[in-house]
Every structure is written in C-alpha cells, then in structure tokens.
Amino acid sequence: MQVTAPRTVLLLLSAALALTETWAGSHSMKYFYTAVSRPGRGEPRFISVGYVDDTQFVWFDSDAASPREEPRAPWIEQEGPEYWDRETQISKTNAQTYRESLRNLRGYYNQSEAGSHIIQRMYGCDMGPDGRLLRGYEQYAYDGKDYIALNEDLSSWTAADTAAQITQRKWEAARWAEQLRAYLEGTCVEWLRRYLENGKETLQRADPPKTHVTHHPISDHEATLRCWALGFYPAEITLTWQRDGEDQTQDTELVETRPAGDRTFQKWAAVVVPSGEEQRYTCHVQHEGLPKPLTLRWEPSSQSTIPIVGIVAGLAVLAVVVIGAVVAAVMCRRKSSGGKGGSYSQAASSDSAQGSDVSLTA
C-alpha cells in the first residue's frame, strides 16, 4: 500500500436477516484511516474517511477546529444526532490509539523520535447481489510499506516483517481476527445494505460516460490519439485501444480513474500512432451505464474540444480524495446504543458502522 497524508499521498453475513431486496452487482463499504506523526509540531494528525462504493460519505480530521465526524453525502445527513455523537467518539478514541501505535512501531523499528511516520489502515466488506458477504479485508501499512493484513479466511494474519510479527502475536493472543470476522460478516454488511437503501438514488445509479477521441501531433511522423471517458459513475470502466482489431495494451498509456468533482469520474487512454494511419485505430469503452460497448475512432473533421475546466476541477478534487483514500482501523465489538433510521435489523440500528469499539494498538 502506498500513502500520503497531509503531505504524503496514499496511492494504500447476516444469515438471520430475511432478504427482501437484491442489488445489481456487488457493492462495498470501506473505511480508510491515516495517522501521521510530526515531531515538534504537536500531536499526530488523524484522518478517517468512509466510502460506499465510489462515494465518500463521512470524514473526520483531528486537526479541525472542533473535530467531529462530518457528512460527505446528502443521504447520510438523515442519520440522527446519536449516530454522529457515536461516530465522533469512536474517531476521537482512535486518534489516541493511533498515537500510541505510532510510538510502538517506532520502537519496533528502532527509529528515532525526530522523523515523521505514517500508519495506515483500510478495512471493509464487499457484498454480493444477494446481500451477503463476498469478502472482507483489513490491511495495514507503515511508512508506505505493507505491515500486516488479515488473510482471506478472516482468521489468520500475514506479517510483512519481524516487527509486524510482534503485532501479529499480540493480536493472536487477543483473538482479534475473530472479532474482525464477526464485524465483517455482520455489522459491516448490515450497514452497507442500509446505506444502499437510504442513498439508492445516487449509490445505485449508473451514469454512462461521455466519450470522444482527440488527436495531438508529435512530429511529422507520429501523433497521439487520446480516448476520453467523462462524467461516468460508478468508477469501474474499461478503455482499450485496438489496431486493425488487435489489442494494443502494451503500447497504451492509461491514467488512473479520477474524480471529476461532481460525484462522477473521468479517465483517458492514449496511443502513439504513425501519421496517416489514425483510422486503423479504434478505442473500445465498456461501462455499466452503457447498453453495449462503444467503439470510437478519431474524426478529423470534428476535432473534439477537451473540457479543460472539468478536468482541472477533477484533479483538484483528486488531491482531496487521495488524502481521503488513506487506510484504516476496524472497531469490531458490538455495543447497543444510538442509531436512528434503517429497518433491516436491530444490529444495524444499534451498532456503529465502523464497529463499536476502538481497535487494538499495533
């Protein structure tokens, strides 16, 4: 896992519930946490971000003037004050837990107090069309490198080095994986279903991409063809170039999918082609919002104008989202208090979406 936080960038089953709905495709809920130490400049900064699919819905920053769990999507604002008080308290407690973990890991690696260090965690669940758990995950990084991760069996750990093995032994003694599994199979999926219902107009939509091909001469002999996909949701999309029907994957420059700033995404794929041979190249676009895949060619008589303003806005939002795409801590033990709204289960009403307790220190 790769990270950044403030200045560094992170590039890291409820069987008893009677199911009355199904969802198209799979959906996910993820939490991303980052803690960054800054010697001589106060306590470490702690940031947490929650996502349902590709939509950010909550945010917490310990550096805020009055740190609170904050809504980042209209549909989450309907949760009652008990929800926000509970989530705020969990995030504040986690901020302290991560400060302790930063001290512990600095000791494990025999590092001085002078440098800045980062802990990241990402956890969450993927849910299938039947509303049940597809997979759960929990991953940790330290200073941008893998540290420890929960295996796919949700009962064992993979430690990256001898320092991480110290954490592994602590967590095995505390039976931490069992608690995580209970959260991932139960509470996580229940809250995800609740959020998908409450935010179905936005979370379960499929906006097709607006597509075009642009032409950029490099020299008298070569030009770049760039295939654009703009304004689509969800983020999953496939762009491929072909020459006379043969894939040009190895010769394609493909950027990561980027947020556009309006709750949609953008992406492009480019190939360098010999001048005069542009019509031998086709761009192929596949997305959930399209009734069938698109095939595009460059049209010399109608050179497309690139919507620069939207792309620049998307890059600005990307900087914010990348800070938000930081990795996370799981809180798994259940406790009953709070939560309004939702009709799926008592657990979803009483337990925190993040889990109801703070995580163990590393």
Curated annotation (Swiss-Prot):
UniProt topological domain (Cytoplasmic) ranges: 333-362
Domain of life where this protein originates: Eukaryota
Xref: SUPFAM superfamilies: Immunoglobulin (SSF48726), MHC antigen-recognition domain (SSF54452)
InterPro entries per UniProt: Ig-like_dom (IPR007110), Ig-like_dom_sf (IPR036179), Ig-like_fold (IPR013783), Ig/MHC_CS (IPR003006), Ig_C1-set (IPR003597), MHC_class-I_related (IPR050208), MHC_I-like_Ag-recog (IPR011161), MHC_I-like_Ag-recog_sf (IPR037055)
Alphabetic keyword roster: Disulfide bond, Glycoprotein, Immunity, Membrane, MHC I, Signal, Transmembrane, Transmembrane helix
Region called Alpha-3, residue ranges: 207-298
UniProt-listed GO biological process terms: antigen processing and presentation of endogenous peptide antigen via MHC class I via ER pathway, TAP-independent; antigen processing and presentation of endogenous peptide antigen via MHC class Ib; immune response; positive regulation of T cell mediated cytotoxicity
Span list, region Alpha-1: 25-114
Gene3D superfamilies in the cross-refs: Immunoglobulins, MHC class I-like antigen recognition-like
Region Alpha-2, residue ranges: 115-206
Region annotated Disordered, chain positions: 336-362
Protein's name according to its UniProt entry: Patr class I histocompatibility antigen, B-2 alpha chain
Organism, scientific name: Pan troglodytes (Chimpanzee)
